[in-house]
A protein has these predicted regions:
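Start-transfer (signal-anchor) and selected internal transmembrane alpha helices
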Residues: 1-31, 112-117, 121-126
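Transmembrane signal-anchor helices characteristic of membrane glycosylation enzymes that use polyprenol
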Residues: 11-46, 97-100, 133-139
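Specific aromatic-rich, kink-prone transmembrane helix
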Residues: 106-109, 150-169
Length: 175
């Protein structure tokens, strides 16, 4: 083995977990990118119309009236998106995809807590990979533009804080 090859092998061996995480993250982004233009029935019949109604009624000013059936925080985020432009399908999906990663990281942290091992890098990386690559997670955010990962992230964080006996934080993230 040449000197350069040895250095490459040593680098890979030292950083295998980080390289694994980067590879999974890259794959997760590519798979989600493939769904960027898919428009589900729910997106057509509800989400796009709600976005347009919020935009037509003045963005943030439209929040005085209920638009759709999502909570006010989600509607506020949608209202902010109306000021950016009219690519609403992408805004819905980007928000949900961002929370896919938050959910995967939260689940991985919680799995590490439950494993009670001192060094649990593998638990973290495997949990992250499993969650971020679940077909239901990918379909919900990247293809359908649904917000399931947003709510699930906060539920996982609630469970994590309850496990740590941080009840005030659990109450805050669940609310």
């Amino acid at each position: 083995m040449f000197k350069i090859e040895r250095k490459i092998v040593e680098f890979v061996e030292r950083n295998v977990n980080i390289l694994f995480m980067l590879a999974i993250t890259g794959l997760a982004i590519v798979v989600r990118y493939a769904g960027r233009d898919f428009v589900s029935g729910d997106m057509t019949w509800f989400l796009l119309g709600w976005f347009q109604k919020i935009a037509d009624n003045g963005g943030i000013h439209s929040l005085k009236d209920q638009v759709g059936d999502y909570n006010i925080l989600y509607q506020t985020i949608v209202a902010i998106f109306t000021y950016i432009g009219d690519k609403s399908i992408y805004y819905y999906k980007i928000l949900s995809i961002f929370f896919d990663f938050c959910m995967a990281i939260s689940a991985a942290i919680f799995a590490c807590e439950l494993s009670k091992k001192e060094k649990n890098d593998k638990v973290f990386f495997v949990t992250f990979a499993a969650v971020i690559m679940l077909p239901t997670v990918i379909l919900n955010s990247a293809y359908w533009g649904q917000c399931d990962s947003i709510y699930t992230t906060f539920i996982i964080l609630t469970l994590l804080y309850l496990y740590r006996e941080k009840y005030h934080r659990a109450f805050l993230v669940l609310g």
